[in-house]
Amino acid sequence: MNDRIIDFDPLIEGVLIKRYKRFLADIELESGEVVTAHCANTGPMKGLLSEGAKVRISFSPSPKRKLPFTWEQICVFNAKNEEVWVGINTLFANKLIKKVIEKNLLIEKIGEIETIKSEVPYGKDKKSRIDFFLTPKSSNPDKRNIFIEVKNTTWIKENVALFPDTVTKRGQKHLMELKELIPESKSVLALCITRKDACFFAPGDDADPLYGSLFRESLSAGMITIPCSFEFHKDHVSWRGIKPLK
């Protein structure tokens, strides 16, 4: 399975000089020019930050932006010494998950969908926002509304994609809130795996043991986990299917 699901203008290629202050990366373009790009991924990016690695960036010359360049992808070598392009722009994850929902690629997990809303307040105090709130079609046997939380996943060990790659209090809170929605609603954790070499998904216990424990508790309570795999190219992203849990 390798379905092209999102197209975009060809990205600009270069080489990573360094990433610093979490939000910034200096990149040398093929012309020799060095530019500073915005890095939307503020995490440690385990296994990705190799200086001299090939990268791809986008260009948006809006006067409202401080930096016209955004770091989108990096090329790494996996355990088989194969080149793998990894999507590192965390802001792109929701766009990908929304696209596969709209294309009915998750129908086996969530059924047919009537409406999709983004950033809907939820939880006891309504101070949290769920990435996607879905209502099912009237023909669905399960009439429950669906709450989907999206997590961008770039870390891999051998062929297992892992999340998180560091301690995430926010992620822990999201799992507890998803668990509280069950059984009145469907709670879904959608992992956006932004590299083609993952065959399985598991929680990143080594990075955040509490997250792993909460993940398994939520799973036992009825949370649905959907590890969504994608392959990144210079001008598009392809769908590689749903991966099993390890």
Curated annotation (Swiss-Prot):
It comes from the Bacteria. GO terms for molecular function: DNA binding. Gene3D superfamilies: 2.40.50.580, 3.40.1350.60. Pfam families: SfsA, SfsA_N. Disulfide bonds: none annotated. InterPro entries: SfsA, SfsA_C, SfsA_N. Belongs to the SfsA family. HAMAP family: SfsA (MF_00095). PANTHER family: SUGAR FERMENTATION STIMULATION PROTEIN A (PTHR30545:SF2). This is Sugar fermentation stimulation protein homolog. It comes from Prochlorococcus marinus (strain AS9601).
